[in-house]
């Protein structure tokens, strides 16, 4: 039976679902919350979004603070009463008028003047200067400072007016208004920092913030705790001290005052710390989601750095790591293209060393017929395009049959089967690849004739060269024999020849595609070699897979 969720877990799940900041949700927005929009959003629309978020939260936080202050003055300190022991024009005239005026003017001034002036560079799509970045990062502090000033002015004004009727009101009003003002300012500071993430991200692109403007996670946490919990608790202690000195509350009234202040402190303190934890967790969750994508092989895109604390450094570090991985993959891809995927993989597994090893392998040598005439009679660009089409067919079939293109030499290519990766029957792979190459060349590039030679046997495969520069290559009789067979195949009707020894070592299935022919003595050899060639197919009988047909269509359209 599953455990029953606590109230905190339910509230946390509700907030995470609403803001889409939970790491278990299907995707994590770039700024940590869908409320902040997308990275691609236009500056004008982003400004409207920020203005609405800041306005709504400032209004909500201040109205809540006003209600709480009224409840504290009314129920926590019932004696003297602001309704019966003070002038009515203060309670029902000046206090509501100042609250309304301060809320309207303060909200307008903060959103239209302070916020807009600090992020004007972002609205105008200008690169931020150092001063712009400083003003943007200081904006949450300025918003909180404006709230403290307005609440302190209101507290001083009301304390003075109420104090004319009873001096006890001075302490009560100053205490209640100051405590609520601090809590409201703290909440507005945190939420303004949240709303400004998209603009802060742009500011942080210009460089790391000065340390004095980014107190770090520890500094931010302790500041929020001090303002959200430390100050209210101090207020409770002040209340007790006030009662001890003034003696104007009964035990029941004192208990009620402490209870109300404690509940207020718990609620506001919990809310402030919850928002702080929520904002702190967002960058971590964004990084965690990005790490999951990297784990799955997705290296596209960088994180948006929107936090000025150590979490922003974490985001920068992640971006640096991904950039390094992308560069590594790019170098790996280039290395694999130059030396072959198998050779590159072997070099990654172990440190390359000069030397070689005996291997049983098969070799395929492919060379274009009449390449000199082709180069002399065609423009260079056309020749290069033709060679690329030719080698694309060769590489495709060699890869498909688990071979390795060891090198390109002008208009010729040398392919190895069985090195560096071992194959159970390298002869089968080499013969099948050679047949496929011959078939595709005849069907896809009839204007190009090429000779193909196949031989198998013992070779020496390894790194040859010097310590400063070496390459993986193969040497041995099969290599030379394949080259001689390739020369001979240029004048053979099938354009493809293999040695009988290679054919005998192949499987019965592969041998069924070949026929033994005449015996010749290859140039440079004393022993005769019996030739083998594939069965001749009637014109138009060449079988093409859907993949090859699509490649032909693409080449012709291109």
From Swiss-Prot:
Alphabetized Pfam families for the sequence: Guanylate_cyc, HAMP
Keywords, in A-Z order: Cell membrane, Membrane, Transmembrane, Transmembrane helix
One GO cellular component term: plasma membrane
HAMP domain boundaries: 279-330
A GO MF term: adenylate cyclase activity
Compartment(s) of residence: Cell membrane
GO biological process: cAMP biosynthetic process; intracellular signal transduction
Guanylate cyclase domain span: 362-486
Gene3D superfamilies the UniProt entry points to: 6.10.340.10, Nucleotide cyclase
The keyword Hydrolase belongs to this UniProt entry's keyword annotation: no
InterPro entries linked to this entry: A/G_cyclase, Adenylyl/Guanylyl_Cyclase_3/4, HAMP_dom, Nucleotide_cyclase
Keyword Cell membrane found: yes
Protein name: Uncharacterized protein MT1361
């Amino acid at each position: 039976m599953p455990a029953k969720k606590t109230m905190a877990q339910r509230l946390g799940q509700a907030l995470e679902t609403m803001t889409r900041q939970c790491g278990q949700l299907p995707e994590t927005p770039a700024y940590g919350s869908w409320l902040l929009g997308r990275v691609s959003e236009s500056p004008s629309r982003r400004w409207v979004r920020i203005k609405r978020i800041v306005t709504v939260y400032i209004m909500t936080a201040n109205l809540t603070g006003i209600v709480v202050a009224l409840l504290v003055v009314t129920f926590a300190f019932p004696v003297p009463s602001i309704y019966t022991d003070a002038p009515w024009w203060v309670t029902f005239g000046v206090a509501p008028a100042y609250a309304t005026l301060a809320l309207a003017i303060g909200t307008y001034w903060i959103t239209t003047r302070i916020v807009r002036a600090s992020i004007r560079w972002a609205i105008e799509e200008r690169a931020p200067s150092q001063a712009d970045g400083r003003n943007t990062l200081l904006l949450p502090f300025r918003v909180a400072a404006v709230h403290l000033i307005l609440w302190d002015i209101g507290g001083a004004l009301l304390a003075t007016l109420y104090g004319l009727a009873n001096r006890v009101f001075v302490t009560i009003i100053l205490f209640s208004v100051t405590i609520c003002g601090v809590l409201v300012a703290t909440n507005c500071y945190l939420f303004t920092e949240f709303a400004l993430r998209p603009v802060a991200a742009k500011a942080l692109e210009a460089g790391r913030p000065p340390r004095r403007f980014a107190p770090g996670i520890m500094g931010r946490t302790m500041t929020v705790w001090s303002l959200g919990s430390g100050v209210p608790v101090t207020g409770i202690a002040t209340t007790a001290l006030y009662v001890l000195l003034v003696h104007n509350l009964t035990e029941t009234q004192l208990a009620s005052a402490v209870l109300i202040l404690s509940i207020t402190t718990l609620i506001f303190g919990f809310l402030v710390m919850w928002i702080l934890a929520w904002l702190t967790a967002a960058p971590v969750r964004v990084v965690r989601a990005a790490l999951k994508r990297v784990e799955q092989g997705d290296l596209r895109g960088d994180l948006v750095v929107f936090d000025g604390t150590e979490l922003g450094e974490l985001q920068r570090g992640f971006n640096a790591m991904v950039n390094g991985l992308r560069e590594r993959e790019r170098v790996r891809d280039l290395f694999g293209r130059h030396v072959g995927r198998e050779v590159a993989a072997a070099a990654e597994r172990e440190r390359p060393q000069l030397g070689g090893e005996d291997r049983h392998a098969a070799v395929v040598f492919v060379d274009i017929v009449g390449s000199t005439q082709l180069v002399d009679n065609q423009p260079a660009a056309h020749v290069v395009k033709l060679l690329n089409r030719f080698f694309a067919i060769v590489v495709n079939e060699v890869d498909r049959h688990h071979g390795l293109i060891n090198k390109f030499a002008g208009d010729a290519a040398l392919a190895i089967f069985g090195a560096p990766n071992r194959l159970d029957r390298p002869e089968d792979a080499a013969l099948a690849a050679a047949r496929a190459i011959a078939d595709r060349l005849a069907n896809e590039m009839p204007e190009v004739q090429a000779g193909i030679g196949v031989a198998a046997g013992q070779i020496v495969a390894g790194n040859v060269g010097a310590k400063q520069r070496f390459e993986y290559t193969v040497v041995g009789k099969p290599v030379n024999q394949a080259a001689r067979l390739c020369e001979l195949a240029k004048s053979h009707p099938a354009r493809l020849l293999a040695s009988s020894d290679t054919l005998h070592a192949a499987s019965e299935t592969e041998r069924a595609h070949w026929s033994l022919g005449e015996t010749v003595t290859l140039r440079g050899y004393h022993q005769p070699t019996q030739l083998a060639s594939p069965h001749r197919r009637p014109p138009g009988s060449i079988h093409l897979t859907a993949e090859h047909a699509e490649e032909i269509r693409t080449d012709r359209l291109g």
